[in-house]
Amino acid sequence: MKKLLFTGLFAALIVACFAQKPYKVVFYNFENLFDTIRNPEIYDEEFTPEGPKKWNTPKYTKKINNLSRVLFDIAAINKDYPVVIGVSEIENRNVMEDVIATPKLAPANYRIVHYDSPDARGVDVAFYYRPDVFKLEGSAPIPFTMESLPNFRTRDVVTMWGTIDGEPFYFMVAHWPSRLGGKEASAPKRERAAEIMRHAADSVLAINPATKVVMMGDFNDDATDKSITEVLGAEGNIRKLQPGGYYNPFIDMLKAGIGSLAYRDQWNLFDNIVVSENLATGSTGSLKLERAPKGKYYGNIFRAPYLFQQEGQYKGYPLRTFVGNNFQGGYSDHLPVFIYIGECQSQYWLRLNISHRAQTT
């Protein structure tokens, strides 16, 4: 009689994580998107028909269509409109509405979160969002305050919160104070702006550690500057992240010489999207930061050829709307940046390794 004796019987549980329906989150500095109407409460004279730029309806319409084209082409990358778009340098809600009323963007049915800020030039930051994906629960501005400069006024931080696929998200968009007066002399203002955003993010995570925080904007500092790496606390190495920490996927890109704006023949990366550790690693929930298909970095910069000067002194620079008061018909002096957020799902296979031998009795 033969018996089969099973030895070395074991099961291995294999877990595979893969991205589905990647969502895009975008930040884009619209570079002085003003309407043509004089507003006596702000300094917008140069962007009027009578001003030095002779800003009129044809130029404004060209600018609106240019911005619409860029956002549509970002959507076309994976045939899906971005879920959230943070923007800066917009004069008011009306100009935002004109952008999304264009035929290219109207199908996305975007909604707007905007607050007028105390900036002297009247430029604000704001959000577009897709209500079919991001379920808005609330929004609020956070004013810039600095004890040593009580009369200094700049853009508010605009925040909004809600859910994506049932998971809590908290978004912030900002345009930190400029380098007017020099990088070092003006650094305390940007460090204070970073402190304000970091405090808000930490407070949100203290209430609910599962909330996924996304901080974006034109920070007027490079991704490797103190305001971002130390004050905001954005880590460039995803493997070094600790719970409650923050990750900046654009640090590696800057170190590789890749930037979002050019100045004096050098690329800078002022446009950043910083995410909380739980979004970077997927330590809570199922949504996490993803690379683009075949992508090297977790951050992305949209670099379509038409966004660049093709000739002249500034060949290779972003094609802006004006150089001085000379209309160029371009897009922005900044390139748009974006990230992908994918859904990480688990699949399980049971692998049986069985060895057997025959035994005669």
Task: Give each language-model segment a name.
Residues 24-27, 83-88, 111-114, 125-129, ...:
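Structural recognition of the beta-strand scaffold that forms the well-ordered cores
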Residues 203-213, 221-353:
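Metal-dependent phosphoester-hydrolase catalytic domains
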Residues 72-76, 92-105, 133, 198-209, ...:
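Sec-exported extracytoplasmic/periplasmic mature domains
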Residues 18-103, 113-125, 297-300, 310-315, ...:
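N-terminal, active-site-proximal structural segment of metallo-dependent hydrolase catalytic domains
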Residues 49-60, 81-87, 114-115, 146-148, ...:
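Second-shell loop/turn segments in exported
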Residues 90-170, 174-176:
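Structured beta-strand-rich core segments of catalytic domains in phosphoester-bond hydrolases
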Residues 1-22, 361:
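Bacterial Sec-dependent N-terminal signal peptides
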Residues 114, 158-253:
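Extracytoplasmic, non-cytosolic globular domains
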